[in-house]
Amino acid sequence: MYAGAGPVLVPPTPTPPLPMPAYTFKPPPRPDFGTSGRTIKLQANFFEMDIPKIEIYHYEIDIKPEKCPRRVNREIVEHMVQHFKAQIFGDRKPVFDGRKNLYTAMPLPIARDKQVELEVTLPGEGKDRIFKVAIKWMACVSLQALHDALSGRLPSVPFETIQALDVVMRHLPSMRYTPVGRSFFTASEGCANPLGGGREVWFGFHQSVRPSLWKMMLNIDVSATAFYKAQPVIEFMCEVLDFKSIEEQQKPLTDSQRVKFTKEIKGLKVEITHCGQMKRKYRVCNVTRRPASHQTFPLQQESGQTVECTVAQYFKDRHKLVLRYPHLPCLQVGQEQKHTYLPLEVCNIVAGQRCIKKLTDNQTSTMIRATARSAPDRQEEISKLMRSASFNTDPFVREFGIMVKDDMTDVTGRVLQPPSILYGGRVWEEPNAPLNKAIATPVQGVWDMRNKQFHTGIEIKVWAIACFAPQRQCTEVHLKTFTEQLRKISRDAGMPIQGQPCFCKYAQGADSVEPMFRHLKNTYTGLQLVVVILPGKTPVYAEVKRVGDTVLGMATQCVQMKNVQRTTPQTLSNLCLKINVKLGGVNNILLPQGRPPVFQQPVIFLGADVTHPPAGDGKKPSIAAVVGSMDAHPNRYCATVRVQQHRQEIIQDLSAMVRELLIQFYKSTRFKPTRIIFYRDGVSEGQFQQVLHHELLAIREACIKLEKDYQPGITFIVVQKRHHTRLFCTDRNERVGKSGNIPAGTTVDTKITHPSEFDFYLCSHAGIQGTSRPSHYHVLWDDNRFSSDELQILTYQLCHTYVRCTRSVSIPAPAYYAHLVAFRARYHLVDKEHDSAEGSHTSGQSNGRDQQALAKAVQVHQDTLRTMYFA
């Protein structure tokens, strides 16, 4: 409750701002600049902007009828500016964001308390369209205030000035290209880049205005995304259903073909081809079950009588068009209740529609191949982009007196020292054997485990093999060789597998998983592991993980058939890394002497992530995962996972999840952590305040619920991978690997970072393909008062503790594990989602039950809970 005076009468306009929460958390200022590591000269794809110290005038635009796409809104405003030049706009060049906001460099002749209403006519294909546009003054946006913020004289960067500058810089590109988010795309001229399934790659560029130390910067990057190919719907259908040509499809579609086709085309816009120049556009809402020859609709005759007429007959009578493919279904377009049907052959897919549905595995790999660029090539492409964009000749940018430098920004980075990695030795062979403690030193983010043994290897005495690959492809000889090789490699790694598997059988289909696993659990006492061999991508995988992780609490390790047919030391060694950890072993640890001071007291590292279902899927829940370290190395982690509201970014049950992890930490170590380091993945800048407010309070609440005075210091760090900052070596000799990337450990916290807050870029991994993307870390809260060096070194070291490989990874292990846990929970939900998605109109009551069923489905078995089942 807010305390205060009695009620005050407020005029109805303008709308008052929403009340802020009783207190807001403010991110900490940057404590200092890092100095650790050797310096390296870099260039960043940031271009300095020269901003005048003027005022910009902000107006609100209201277009009726509403809900036009931005492209249409832009046309309306452009027509308005031309048409009312004499009365209102004169020589001014306003910029518009496509929604509500219009900015001018000089004020318009509109009184501040008045609203001007104009009528704008857009010439249409059939008839002209008339719109009513209202303009009213909103505010003056001071660019002087921006200068004050960048130089540290103001505590925070005014959001409205950045928004205004962004609109100025995006106005012309938005008219020329197809905008998607903060990027602009255009169809590749001359050379198509097909992805299959009616999709293709469009190339473009990302552009955003960013505040940095002392200067505003323009961040420019090359960008690519999937669009639907503009083509006849018949051809689109052939691509989706893998028909060589339409001629081979003389029969109606089967149910499964129709369902697959519907899934792909639903929601897309098509244009008709049978009405000459009038290419009306419609949005597809469904595909009919019946072919055009049998699909009927109520047709009103001239006499006023209504008769049922087939689509094929209607096109013959009305349009003198005999359908070539009457055996194919129709598209249902517009509103579902209106029964508007179009034969496939009179429709084309409208150009410029971005594909938001999930790409298939093949499409994803084609996309990566088409878009991967070595760092020097990408640098050259970005420079070329800047030259062709030529912002300094853009009339709208010049109108506001803005200049942009043509060259990338020079930045001094630092390459941090990698930590030493400690392995173990043969402890169980002979009591007096020397402990072969081996230390590995990463070089360019990679180290070698050869001649070394796990820090703590597990002895495997009882294990089983279940082969779901066909016996003729994966023979008994293959299985025998695989078993021998795995035992040899595991022995060398210090994880001895004693004896042959207690069970080795062939099986088929997901339905046989649970009965087989129950038999194994009941028959073989002390069974530690089931190795499952899979024939490529199959539903068996999801079922193995569901049964193993959530139903019976059994450790499982899946192996692809091709890796059994041809074993390599590398794949077997990688298998051992995963198996040892799943069974409670420790592969390696950070050398204790080299760890940062934060390890001097009990500390828990938490990683958190929320994964959302693919776009266009409105039913599936989002999944929140939080993992916590369970030892001082830190090496072992425990996981908690929840389903939550569809596309909800804030972790709703965080307090209970953190409480569970703190209890587990205490059980594992007999210590209460005095510090909590929380790495939060997957939050965009616009959500910082909201996420921080809710989640920091949730972590505090978890502590206080355990003990009234328990107040460990919390450091809350957001980890971001989905940004467009790229760093390039200035000196050719510093470039690493085939792709010419920056070295692993490269850190930047000056010039391109936030003017006042605590953030930094760290590229902790060695780039293998394409240009490395440094991770961006933004500290939103810090009770522990880290210096820049301490936090940067700690973060870099945690990137070396990921158990699945002997390389440093691109984000700290706890954040990576949270991602794996959420991803695994998707598999646990597979059949539950299928069940609950069958009927789309479920009542409110059953939804509550569905929610409970989903929550239960991701609940991991008690025996699995304390293991790293997700590794």
Swiss-Prot record:
Start and end residues of each stretch annotated as Disordered: 834-856
GO biological process terms on file: miRNA-mediated gene silencing by inhibition of translation; miRNA-mediated gene silencing by mRNA destabilization; negative regulation of translational initiation; positive regulation of nuclear-transcribed mRNA catabolic process, deadenylation-dependent decay; positive regulation of nuclear-transcribed mRNA poly(A) tail shortening; pre-miRNA processing; regulation of DNA-templated transcription; regulatory ncRNA-mediated gene silencing
Origin: domain of life: Eukaryota
Any single GO CC term annotated in Swiss-Prot or TrEMBL for this entry: RISC-loading complex
Keywords: Cytoplasm, Endonuclease, Hydrolase, Magnesium, Manganese, Metal-binding, Nuclease, Ribonucleoprotein, RNA-binding, RNA-mediated gene silencing, Translation regulation
Start and end residues of each Piwi domain: 529-830
Compartmental location: Cytoplasm, P-body
Predominant place of localization: cytoplasm
Record region (Interaction with guide RNA): 314-319, 536-578, 721-722, 765-773, 802-824
A GO MF term: siRNA binding
Coiled-coil annotated spans: none
Free-text domain note: The Piwi domain may perform RNA cleavage by a mechanism similar to that of RNase H. However, while RNase H utilizes a triad of Asp-Asp-Glu (DDE) for metal ion coordination, this protein appears to utilize a triad of Asp-Asp-His (DDH).
Function: Required for RNA-mediated gene silencing (RNAi) by the RNA-induced silencing complex (RISC). The 'minimal RISC' appears to include ago2 bound to a short guide RNA such as a microRNA (miRNA) or short interfering RNA (siRNA). These guide RNAs direct RISC to complementary mRNAs that are targets for RISC-mediated gene silencing. The precise mechanism of gene silencing depends on the degree of complementarity between the miRNA or siRNA and its target. Binding of RISC to a perfectly complementary mRNA generally results in silencing due to endonucleolytic cleavage of the mRNA specifically by ago2.
Protein name per UniProt: Protein argonaute-2
Protein's organism: Xenopus tropicalis
Name of the encoding gene: ago2
